[in-house]
């Protein structure tokens, strides 16, 4: 779940290099470089100026690039298709991209419609790490799918005021964390969530937790309501403790 976020006051929904740089500067101030393991971004997070910012701030990154990106390999300019050839996967270090020498991992995949596509991940570390690290971005996709259309329907709020949207988003983030932790606790201590033939769980941890909390709120079971209340307050106390710690950290370095 997000620990820091900003709302963009534009209609496109896309961020500029300046937007991304400003956001990361605030995160670095809040957390410190040593607590940021890496930056994982999709195809929007590209460009030599953004790469330069990441280099200057000593941040490792794993960023998906577009398939029309021109690569410089051993002095020769290549498209991704030419680089991959007939292979299913290719890992290369010391590849020229946007004026930098970086590492790249390329893999054949299928898009959401089942058509052939490429997954190309650029990194300033090593090519063999790129695909595995980029998979962590899937949890971000799951989070946004959950808050948009699988439970909270955030976009149906029709709020326009940026401050109100920001507050609502913060509360939804906390609610998501509560549902997720409830589902994980159920899976761990009550009953394992069954796995279907397609290897996915019958219900995600989030969905299971959301269903449990909904059922509790719809009943008059005082014991269940009491336990839910305690669970919520534990989460709130955890957030308060961490906020206090971060605020103290900011005062010390500021």
Language-model features, listed with the residues they occupy:
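Single, function-defining residue in the core of a domain
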Residues: 1-254
């Amino acid at each position: 779940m997000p620990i820091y976020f900003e709302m963009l006051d534009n209609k496109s929904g896309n961020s500029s290099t300046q937007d991304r740089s400003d956001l990361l500067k605030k995160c670095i101030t809040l957390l410190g470089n040593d607590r940021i393991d890496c930056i994982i971004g999709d195809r929007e997070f590209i460009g030599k100026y953004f790469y330069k910012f990441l280099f200057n701030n000593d941040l490792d990154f794993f960023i998906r690039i577009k398939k029309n990106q021109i690569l410089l390999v051993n002095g020769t300019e290549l498209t991704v298709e030419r680089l991959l050839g007939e292979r299913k996967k290719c890992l290369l270090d010391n590849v020229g991209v946007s004026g930098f020498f970086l590492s790249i991992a390329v893999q054949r995949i299928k898009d959401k419609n089942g058509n052939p596509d490429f997954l190309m991940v650029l990194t300033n570390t090593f090519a063999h790490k790129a695909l595995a690290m980029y998979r962590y971005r899937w949890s971000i996709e799951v989070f946004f799918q959950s808050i948009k259309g699988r439970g909270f329907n955030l976009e149906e709020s029709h709020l326009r005021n940026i401050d109100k949207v920001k507050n609502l988003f913060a509360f939804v983030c906390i609610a998501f964390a509560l549902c997720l932790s409830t589902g994980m606790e159920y899976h761990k201590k009550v009953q394992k969530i069954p796995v279907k033939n397609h290897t996915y769980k019958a219900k995600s941890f989030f969905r299971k937790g959301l269903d449990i909390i909904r059922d509790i709120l719809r009943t008059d079971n005082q014991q269940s309501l009491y336990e839910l209340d305690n669970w919520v307050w534990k989460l709130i106390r955890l957030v308060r403790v961490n906020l206090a710690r971060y605020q103290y950290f900011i005062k010390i370095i500021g």
